[in-house]
Amino acid sequence: MHRPNFQFSVLSLQFSVLLAFAAPAFSQATFPTPTLTSISPLGAKPGASIELTLRGVDLEGPQSVLLNERTIPLKSVKPNVFSITLPADLKPALYDCRFIGRYGVSNPRVFEVTTLDSIDSTGANAKPDKALKVSLNSVVEGCFKSNSPHWFSVELKKGQHLTATFDGRRFDTRTELLGALLAPTGRELAHMRAGVLAFTAAADATYFLRVNELMYRTGDDYGYRITLSSVAPPAQRTVMLEDVRPILIGQTVRDYFLPVGLPQVFDLPFKAGEKFIIEVHSHQLGHATDPHLVIENLAKDPAGKETLKPQAEVADAPAIVPAPSINLPSRDPSYAYEAKADGAFRITLSDNFATTQPYELRILKEAPKLEDLIALNPILPGAKTKGGEIGSANVPRGGIAALEIIAPNRNALSEPLELKADKLPAGVTCLGGFIGKGQSLGYIAFQASADAPAGASLLSGIPHSRFVCYAVADATRDNVLYRTTGAPALGVSAQPAPAFVQTEKTDILEVAADAKLDIALKVTRHADFTDALKLKALGLIDIAKAPEADIPAKAAAGKFTLDVKALKLAPGDYGFILQGPAKMKVQRNVDALAAAEARLKEAEEAIVKAGNEREFGKRIRENPKPGDDLEANEKALKLAFEAEAQAEADKKAASALIKNINAKSPPKDATFIVYSNPIRIRVKEVAKK
């Protein structure tokens, strides 16, 4: 007789319950959404089979991970540990690793694919005599579980190079690594600076590498992955201060800033009537730089004597208005110019932060045809303390969700921009979006059908996304770390939406600049959601002053009044979206609960089956017939009693687990984000009287 192997299942489920209780830290919105706080290992070889540990919240119903656009199935080994096999054709690079499960897709964490062998540091190598032996052209990976340093030994021949590199920000960890290379005598020979330790051996010897976290912080967030290379870092190009390099319209120079803020100089000739844009890209490429751009008019007399007259000294890029939900400053300057006569500019470029980080100097003939869009996960406004939230990029079933879109490097002459995205998850429709002329912020919305399957895909049409790396409760007490990466992923959550809002008309709504516009709204509600809604208009003005739509409790319709005159909207086209909170009860750990209920049902069925077999055997015992095998019947009867007892015990255990899950994770109010479809308006000139 089949007896369910229930004991292990109960233990597994109990672990799952404990791991899935917490809601995303510090978030105004508390609806279930997968959040990855760390992963390990931080990398592997193409084609490797590894056990991947995923830490975070709401990691229920695991399906797969996304490595950029590649979907890799997950096979559960134990709670939050999964077996995966990397595709053999993955190219060596840094990838965005995202979890996909019941509630959609998580934020990304960095995962490196490399052809180098990897050595794991468990932390047992906390003293020099316990140093872990490593070799050149390999990777060392570990995590600081205690404040002790990690020690490694490496054999080097005279003249061999050792370059050890690690950048915690690049790997999306909190680790700030200190590293030192020591001689066999213990004398320090080289130190890690800006994530690089470079050393050339003066003699054959066994050298020691010591690494520790800068402030001796510990925990799963403090991992590292150091590449040990035999190739010396490239020598910096020597540029004399008197060097002046030519540059032409349409060209891009890629180089490094000079040490201690020394300037680099370029001459740019132009003809009358030419239009061009001078752009410096460094800070927005992820470097901690503050480029300084000085432009002067260059003239030469017949003898070749130069005369310089100031043209412009360009500061940081202007702040985006209205401000996005995630801080997105740009310290990269740009300057647009239309030449009235033939001439030349003397361009001087340096870094106010005096780094030697990379930069790009672009001389564009015109604004790029394809906007360099950046997607942000919008959050609910109104937090009393300004912090950092990871946000969500998941559409609930039967609901609408939106991504906030930033178009950097735009100016007053930038053309309107229609927002589109392709390669959507199954069951999802793109509702589009809009950024007006000269504006830099907009919203693109997506709607999921009521039966859309949980899943995710990497969107096309939006090249970049920006994330808060770690949730921060108070940005005045802790730094909010951001990371800009590739295209955003959009997920579908199996959790139904409490409501979504639609305008009765989806075409462009026209209004005079001195008038009010009434917009009729339709509300589709979940059966369990009857509360009133207060929605803010995002994308027009600063969120603190944004107009609101109030929809009464239980109402299926409402109205949004836009006072264009009060908002001082200039004539032109605008796009915005309505967003607000909605509370609805949600029970987390539904997978654990469903599994426990399935075990309970299995145990109850086993009780019935064993009971029937017991009664059948008792009837044979009490009223035997010729030909009955009484000995076999007694054995079967004994097994039936044992099976029934085991099934009763399994039922008791399953019932206790269900009670435990419901007690620890009862249905609770969760705050969702409710959206409308994107709304377009056209503000017209006031009619002359």
Show the residue positions of the predicted features.
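Charged, low-complexity interaction regions
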Residues: R619-L630
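Short, basic, low-complexity termini and linkers enriched in Ser/Thr/Gly/Pro
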Residues: R3-F21
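Acidic, Ser/Thr/Pro-rich low-complexity intrinsically disordered segments
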Residues: F31-P79, A88, P92, R102, ...
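Aromatic sugar-binding surface patches on proteins
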Residues: V77-S83, L328-P333, G438-I444, K554-T561
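Sec/Tat signal peptide C-region and signal peptidase I cleavage site
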Residues: A23-S27
